[in-house]
From Swiss-Prot:
Gene3D superfamilies: Cobalt-precorrin-4 Transmethylase, Domain 1 (3.40.1010.10), Methyltransferase, Cobalt-precorrin-4 Transmethylase, Domain 2 (3.30.950.10), NAD(P)-binding Rossmann-like Domain (3.40.50.720), Sirohaem synthase, dimerisation domain (1.10.8.210), Siroheme synthase, domain 2 (3.30.160.110)
Residues reported in the UniProt entry to bind NAD(+): D22, I23, P43, S44
Pathway as given in its UniProt record: Cofactor biosynthesis; adenosylcobalamin biosynthesis; precorrin-2 from uroporphyrinogen III: step 1/1; Cofactor biosynthesis; adenosylcobalamin biosynthesis; sirohydrochlorin from precorrin-2: step 1/1; Porphyrin-containing compound metabolism; siroheme biosynthesis; precorrin-2 from uroporphyrinogen III: step 1/1; Porphyrin-containing compound metabolism; siroheme biosynthesis; siroheme from sirohydrochlorin: step 1/1
Biological role stated in the UniProt entry: Then it catalyzes the NAD-dependent ring dehydrogenation of precorrin-2 to yield sirohydrochlorin. Finally, it catalyzes the ferrochelation of sirohydrochlorin to yield siroheme.
Name of the molecule in the record: Siroheme synthase
Ligand binding (S-adenosyl-L-methionine): P223, G299, G300, D301, T329, A330, M381, G410
Entry annotation: catalytic residues: D246 (proton acceptor), K268 (proton donor)
Entry-linked CDD domains: SUMT
């Protein structure tokens, strides 16, 4: 870290600005907005700067070191490099922080790009290395941060003591503020400057006093790429106090979990349940009973070939509140990253998702229906069962030459796509690792031309496409 970000209180503090032109004008606006007691030294002044300095000090002179006396900060904002260098040297000798505009090497501090939602302030800097990138980031942040953010912060400051007195424990207070800060109704009241109504909203919410109970939120983490996590999913994992996660949740998604949340790996993976389901249920319930906000984080979509419904049924039986945040399932995410459309006007009018890992005493699927030629068949957790799947599909009429694709670790930098035909599927599966998705149908051949993520896809077991 080349610079330590700091916020300086300049109200009524002495600040010296050397320069009187356009460059100095821009800095003067910032310093005056911060309440500085400004002294400007320059042979002449920009007309607008003259107006700004009413109530402040202007010295019509060239800079000398004597003007540094009693100053907290110094800004050199001239277009004369020699003068700027002289100011920097004198300030360094006097042990006063100095900024030379557009010259970080001579500066002991620099001005960041500022997004002002006072009292909320956001500062962005590249240390002078990438000013265009900083400008782009500032524009994005300006669009992202609502204009009422400052009013929201001021309102929270006004209510802080009342909330602390009413809600005795820190968990209840945090939940109150999270609800307030996420409320569309409160946001609308502040955006439209209905301050009395905003105050009443706060009073009503505080009176409700429902912030102590636990809850369970079932969140789909998506297929691997952290960019595919939904916005609501991100919000939930950043508000969680306890997170129970599967092996299929990528490290990149786990890195987005709130830092002080308790993380518990329950290790679920096809055929390998390191924590039995009844123990997972009890972990969820016990933490929720203790008043915690618990997130059950599952790979893909939580209701797609997982046991999310069973977990929520356990919560319902205990009377524990719950909610669900859907995620992008592997059938949608992995196929898209492999360049395989699930449906196509010419060859696939439907798509069917099945699991290759069923209960041992479960009924056989309808293989005749699954072998239909005008549909895409997507199989989750099908590596181990691929020989039996291949045999049954061919026996029920699916062509042995039907294109197939096996997508390993879809949407991640370690994605591999193995291409072949249905009759080659068992051999392809021998070279694949979990998690993998099997796609059977004419659309699988389109990966040859529609592949976009990391490289081209080739056919045949001998061509393992590593997209890392």
């Amino acid at each position: 870290m080349d610079y330590l970000p700091l916020f300086a209180r300049l109200n009524n503090r002495a600040v010296l600005l050397v320069g009187g032109g356009d460059i100095a004008l821009r800095k003067a606006r910032l310093l005056l907005d911060a309440g500085a007691n400004l002294t400007v030294v320059a042979p002449s002044l920009h007309e607008e700067l003259t107006e700004l300095l009413v109530g402040h000090t202007y010295i019509p002179s060239r800079f000398t070191a004597a003007y540094l006396n009693d100053q907290m900060l110094v800004i050199a904002a001239t277009d004369d490099e020699e003068v700027n260098a002289e100011v920097a040297a004198a300030a360094d000798a006097a042990n006063i922080w100095v900024n030379v505009v557009d010259d970080p090497d001579r500066s002991s501090f620099i001005f960041p790009s500022i997004i002002d939602r006072s009292p909320i302030m956001v500062a962005v800097s590249s240390g002078g290395k990438a000013p265009v990138l900083v400008r782009m980031l500032r524009e994005r942040l300006e669009a992202l941060l609502p204009k009422h953010l400052g009013a929201l912060a001021n309102l929270s400051g006004e209510w802080r003591n009342q909330i602390k007195q009413k809600l005795g424990d820190i968990t209840s207070r945090r939940r109150f503020w999270e609800k307030a800060f996420a409320s569309p109704q409160l946001a609308t009241l502040l955006e439209t400057e209905q301050h009395d109504s905003a105050e009443q909203w706060m009073a009503d919410q505080l009176q409700a006093d429902d912030y102590a109970g636990g809850e369970i939120v079932l969140v789909g983490a998506g297929p691997g790429d952290a960019g595919l996590l939904t916005l609501k999913g991100l919000q939930q994992i950043q508000q969680a106090e306890v997170v129970l996660y599967d092996q299929l949740v990528s490290p990149e998604v786990l890195n987005l979990v709130r830092r002080d949340a308790e993380r518990i790996s329950v290790g679920k993976k096809a055929g390998h349940h390191s924590v039995p389901q009844h123990e997972i249920n009890e972990l969820l319930l016990s933490h929720a009973r203790a008043g915690k906000r618990v997130v059950r984080l599952k790979g893909g979509d939580p209701f797609m070939f997982g046991r999310g419904a069973e977990e929520l049924q356990a919560a319902r039986a205990e009377g524990i509140p719950f909610s669900v945040v859907p995620g992008i399932t592997a059938a949608a995410g992995a196929t898209a990253y492999a360049g395989i459309p699930l449906t196509h006007r010419d060859s696939a009018q439907s798509a069917v998702f099945i699991t290759g890992h069923c209960k041992q005493d479960g009924e056989e699927p309808d293989w005749a229906a699954l072998a239909a030629s005008n549909q895409t068949l997507v199989i989750y957790m099908g590596l181990i069962g691929s020989p039996a799947i291949t045999e049954r599909l061919i026996a029920h009429g699916r062509r042995p030459e039907t294109p197939v694709a096996l997508i390993e670790r879809g949407t991640t930098v370690r994605q591999r796509v193995l291409r072949g035909t249905l009759q080659e599927l068992p051999e392809l599966a021998k070279d694949a690792h979990s998690p993998s998705l099997i796609v059977i149908g004419e659309v699988a051949a389109l990966a040859d031309t529609l592949s976009w993520f990391g490289g081209d896809t080739a056919s045949g077991k001998e061509h393992l496409i590593n997209l890392a």
